[in-house]
Design a protein with these regions (language model features):
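N-terminal acidic leader/helix
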Residues: 1-32
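Secondary-structure edge/capping motif, primarily at the C-terminal ends of alpha-helices
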Residues: 14-25, 43-47, 70-74
Length: 74
């Protein structure tokens, strides 16, 4: 069974990153990105369910895109 709350936390973290980017706040956006990435790695270490792995890989793609945006802000 997928741990929905964990993914909700990740979604909230991603939303915070997006808000920081919207406010041109590269420093906080980057710090939050590191935090969310670590949470994602943690999840990855503790799952072997296909559904969760698919969800995690979506977040990884999203975080990579956000990282590019943060870099372009700096």
């Amino acid at each position: 069974i997928m741990d929905i709350t964990k993914f909700d936390e990740l979604k909230n973290g991603v939303q915070e990153i997006i808000d920081f980017i919207g406010n041109k706040n590269a420093k906080d956006a980057n710090n939050k990105l590191v935090e969310v990435s670590e949470e994602l790695d943690e999840l990855l270490d503790h799952t072997d369910e296909d559904e969760e792995l698919r969800e995690i890989s979506k977040f990884q793609v999203l975080l990579n895109q956000l990282q590019q945006k943060i870099i372009s802000l700096q």
